[in-house]
């Protein structure tokens, strides 16, 4: 920053403090309007661009889900769900569910009060499932053949019904409802030899009308739109009705409320986030020994949130977990850093017996350059995320840059200005806060304002913006305006008394923190720079070796409390389904699908899936999930009623001479598929076994001959990302072979396992691209402003060390790269460069005063070094508390951020001083 420009800014800040603070206040009030009225309703997408997402979008568009499935796992405490007690109780709860639905009482969230449950004709079993896709209706149909109902049936009769279902090839698919631990033994029942099946658990799904719920495909993950949230409210409502209070069975939802669970855990983590802010503010107050510093910083952080949300709304940034929670939490550290450096420097100058206004002038003169550079480099670090292909990351970088600018204005400039005005009032009022009574008042007031402002912040960020703003306003009035009004009143009393009593000497804070210890650490380091830098280089080399081993991994337990029903339900699913089921993936196929040879190629591809280790084969022998074009073709050729209807409708006779389930000619196949899309498929006695809506979820017939189908399959163990990668690699050769068929135009892989893999890969790529961009941009900016490439490089180099150390620790502690941990890299650059800039700028300032680098570094350590320790302590203690939050995502973020800030402090106090004395522009180049 040029000296003339800097001088003008300093004079403006110190001369027009009142108008400047007034403008900031008016701007804050103005931002309240967009904060409420222009708040985004859309969430930033966590998905990058790419084929896997394009295919998923086309699949969702071409194959609209008519039914929303809510999956559950029911487990018997007695080890067998195939008993009268469990099944009759389950049926009773289902009947209660039906009754509530008819009355519109299942509606939850913002859903309209109307019936939602639907029936489903299972094409594999040929049985109509009434609202619940479960083993209950198949068992009930067999019991009716015997002449009893579930309520009347004995254990033997139920076991007989299960045996008949499983032993019949047409209904053996009921095995897929049972636990992988299900077993059987031969027994005689009513003179019939049967297999007596015992299953500790069963899976089932409740079916609702997806169109009434807003449509859309299956979405499991944080960041859902309002329709997804409403579905989750409905899922929870259904579970409440089906839970059995008498203990006949235990019920687990299977990922039925990902967003609501995240919201609940986020709210339960709110107290820890609030404690983080409280501790940060109290440490600031302790470090500066000032109630006013605590109050100004606490209220300043609250105003910072208004600026962040208001400006974000003005420029159209979307919301999301990261923008709404992670960015505000991160800004606690950066905001505290701006405040402590500005306020600490002001107190240093004031302790030199300057008047408050002169002290402010000296402080701003000394620290403004560093604050501006910190603001610019922080912004560059965060804006480097604009290189990402992920919308949520781009909006994160933009929001963080806004917050950095707001921190600079509010806590770096306005905070010391306001403290100066308070000190002027205190001097004019002859007010001195000495004695035990004043000390107790300061401590009580500091705790009160810390708690109140933290409450306002957490309310604005996570609960209610309106209540948060009101709370912040009340906090400002109670803890800032009223004390200032008291000083004004006292000043008027003093003026009326015309008192000319001399003021006592100003109290000098000689030990705000352990200054000798900080000086000792820094000076001992700079006396042996080569040794220190050599050790740092060795540690960094080892760290890089381990850091590059970090892999992108997703596991639900990294995001949700391990004791939550979300995690327990998935654990139960793994336990009872194992390798016979898993997360669905899909192969997208587009081509001339009315060519029988194309269907034969698809059929061969489906059979080849059995040879891939990571693809599940159900207990009934199916390797695909749901319908595809080959299934529809086989249902048509197996149905004489459908064949007759097609011939009557179109004049085309369906034949299948080789009995492969595929019509012999192109004309036959096209006629069959088009009939099925319009009318469905008929079974025995002309009863419909496939509805048109079901067909439309298996085949999309295009007027231009490019038809589409999806081949769904299941992948067990996708919580281990290496399984997804291995599956993708294993299936690729088969995909290439299928696409090589002349009638197949495009083949691709999609589904949630592969979209998540792409998300993780893009998050990692963002780290790899944004990090060098931020570092290079920081070096260029600092070189231009400092007019020294050496100083700029020395300032930025410790940040590289911090990132390497941090990710090596992550690897050692068992963390993995994901959306949240990847962002910590960007935050570490922002905080690390902050610390480095303040040390470098202060050292250069002191070097101009004294020629000896040791003395210059000693002054730097006693001034800026102390401020760095205060800033770091406030953040480390606060974020360490967040590390105890029940939600693992917040806990990991808090712990790793605390570690990162500590590493940044060490790098700034130990490594950076050694670099500075090596490159110092002084006659005595080395100590």
Regions from the PLM with identified roles:
Residues 261, 265-271, 338, 351-388, ...:
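Pore- and gate-forming transmembrane helices of large, multi-pass membrane proteins
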Residues 19-27, 272-280, 301, 305, ...:
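Hydrophobic alpha-helical transmembrane segments in multi-pass membrane proteins
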Residues 706-709, 714-927:
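C-terminal transmembrane helical bundles of large multi-pass transporters
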Residues 34, 283, 372-415, 419-425, ...:
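Hydrophobic, glycine/alanine-rich multi-pass transmembrane helices and their short helix-loop junctions
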Residues 1-292, 426-768, 772, 921-923:
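Feature of extramembrane
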Residues 42-47, 290-299, 314-331, 385-401, ...:
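Membrane-water interface of transmembrane alpha-helices in multipass transporters/channels
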Residues 330-351, 371, 377-380, 408-415, ...:
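Short helical (or helix-break) motifs at transmembrane helix termini and adjacent helical loops
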Residues 14, 216, 259, 263-318, ...:
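Interfacial segments of transmembrane alpha-helices in multi-pass membrane proteins
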């Amino acid at each position: 920053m040029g000296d003339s420009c800097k001088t003008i800014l300093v004079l403006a800040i110190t001369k027009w403090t009142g108008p400047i603070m007034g403008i900031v206040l008016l701007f804050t009030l103005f931002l309240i309007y967009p904060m409420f009225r222009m708040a985004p309703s859309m969430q930033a997408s966590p998905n990058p661009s790419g084929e896997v997402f394009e295919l998923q979008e086309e699949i969702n568009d071409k194959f609209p889900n008519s039914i929303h499935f809510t999956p559950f796992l029911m487990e018997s405490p007695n080890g067998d769900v195939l008993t009268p007690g469990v099944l009759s109780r389950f049926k009773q709860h289902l009947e209660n569910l039906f009754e509530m639905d008819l009355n519109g009482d299942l509606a939850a969230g913002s859903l309209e009060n109307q019936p939602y449950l639907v029936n489903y004709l299972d094409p594999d079993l040929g049985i109509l499932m009434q609202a619940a896709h479960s083993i209950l209706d198949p068992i009930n149909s067999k019991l009716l053949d015997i002449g009893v109902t579930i309520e009347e049936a004995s254990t033997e009769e139920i076991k007989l019904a299960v045996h008949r279902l499983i032993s019949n090839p047409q209904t053996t698919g009921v095995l897929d409802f049972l636990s992988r631990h299900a077993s059987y033994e031969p027994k005689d029942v009513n003179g019939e030899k049967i297999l007596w099946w015992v299953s500790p658990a069963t899976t089932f799904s409740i079916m609702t009308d997806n169109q009434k719920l807003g449509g859309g495909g299956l979405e499991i993950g944080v960041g859902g739109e309002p329709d997804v949230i409403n579905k989750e409210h409905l899922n929870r409502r259904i579970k409440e009705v089906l839970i059995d209070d008498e203990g006949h069975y235990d019920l687990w939802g299977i990922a039925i409320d990902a967003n609501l669970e995240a919201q609940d855990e986020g709210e339960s983590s709110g107290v820890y986030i609030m404690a983080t802010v409280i501790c940060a503010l109290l440490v600031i107050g302790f470090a500066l020994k000032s109630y006013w510093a605590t109050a100004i910083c606490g209220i300043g952080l609250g105003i910072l949130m208004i600026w962040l949300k208001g400006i974000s709304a003005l420029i159209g940034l979307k919301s999301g977990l990261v923008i709404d929670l992670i960015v505000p939490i991160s800004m606690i550290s950066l905001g505290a850093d701006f405040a402590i450096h500005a306020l600490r420097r002001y107190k240093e100058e004031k302790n030199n017996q300057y008047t408050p206004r002169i002290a402010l002038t000296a402080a701003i003169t000394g620290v403004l350059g560093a604050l501006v550079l910190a603001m610019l480099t922080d912004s560059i670090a965060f804006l480097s995320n604009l290189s990402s292909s992920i919308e949520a990351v781009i909006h994160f970088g933009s929001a963080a840059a806004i917050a950095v600018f707001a921190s600079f204005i509010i806590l770096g400039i306005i905070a010391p200005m306001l403290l100066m005005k308070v000190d002027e009032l205190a001097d004019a009022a002859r007010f001195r806060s000495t004695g035990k009574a004043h000390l107790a008042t300061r401590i009580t007031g500091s705790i009160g304002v810390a708690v109140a402002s933290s409450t306002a912040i957490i309310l604005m960020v996570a609960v209610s913006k309106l209540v948060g703003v009101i709370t912040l306003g009340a906090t400002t009035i109670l803890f800032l305006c009223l004390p200032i009004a008291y000083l004004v009143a006292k000043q008027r009393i003093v003026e009326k008394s015309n008192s000319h009593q001399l003021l006592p000497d100003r109290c000098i804070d000689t030990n705000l923190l352990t200054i000798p210890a900080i000086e000792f650490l820094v000076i001992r380091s700079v006396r042996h720079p080569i040794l220190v830098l050599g050790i740092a280089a060795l540690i960094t080399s080892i760290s890089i070796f381990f850091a590059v081993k970090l892999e992108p991994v997703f596991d639900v337990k990294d995001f949700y409390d391990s004791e939550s029903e979300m995690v327990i339900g998935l654990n139960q699913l793994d336990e009872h389904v194992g390798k016979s089921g898993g997360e669905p993936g899909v192969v997208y196929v587009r081509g001339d699908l009315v060519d029988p040879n194309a269907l034969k190629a698809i059929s061969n591809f489906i059979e080849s899936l059995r040879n891939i280790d990571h693809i599940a084969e159900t207990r009934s022998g199916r390797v695909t999930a749901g319908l595809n074009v080959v299934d529809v073709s086989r249902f048509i050729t197996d149905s004489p009623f459908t064949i007759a209807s097609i011939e009557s409708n179109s004049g085309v006779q369906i034949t299948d001479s080789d009995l492969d389930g595929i019509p012999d000619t192109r004309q036959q196949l096209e006629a069959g598929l088009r009939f099925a899309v319009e009318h469905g498929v008929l079974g025995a006695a002309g009863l419909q076994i496939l509805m048109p809506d079901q067909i439309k979820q298996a085949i999309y017939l295009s007027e231009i001959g490019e038809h589409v189908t999806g081949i769904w399959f299941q992948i067990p163990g996708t919580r281990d990302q290496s399984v997804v990668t291995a599956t993708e690699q294993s299936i690729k050769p088969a995909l290439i072979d299928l696409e090589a068929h002349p009638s197949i135009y495009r083949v691709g892989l999609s589904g949630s396992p592969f979209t998540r893999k792409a998300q993780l890969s893009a998050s990692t790529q963002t780290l790899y691209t944004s990090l060098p961009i931020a570092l290079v941009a920081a070096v260029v900016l600092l070189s231009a402003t400092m007019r020294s490439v050496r100083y700029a490089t020395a300032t930025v180099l410790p940040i590289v060390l911090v990132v390497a150390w941090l990710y090596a620790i992550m690897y050692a502690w068992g963390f993995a790269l994901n959306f949240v941990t990847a962002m910590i890299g960007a935050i570490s650059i922002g905080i690390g460069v902050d610390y480095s800039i303040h040390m470098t700028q202060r050292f250069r300032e002191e070097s101009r005063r004294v020629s000896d680098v040791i003395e210059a570094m000693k002054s730097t350590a006693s001034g800026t070094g102390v401020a760095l320790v205060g800033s770091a302590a406030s953040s480390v203690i606060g974020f360490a508390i967040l590390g105890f939050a029940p939600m693992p995502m917040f806990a990991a973020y808090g712990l790793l951020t605390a570690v990162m800030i500590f590493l940044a402090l060490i790098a700034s106090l130990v490594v950076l001083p050694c670099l500075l004395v090596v490159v110092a522009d002084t006659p005595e180049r080395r100590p």
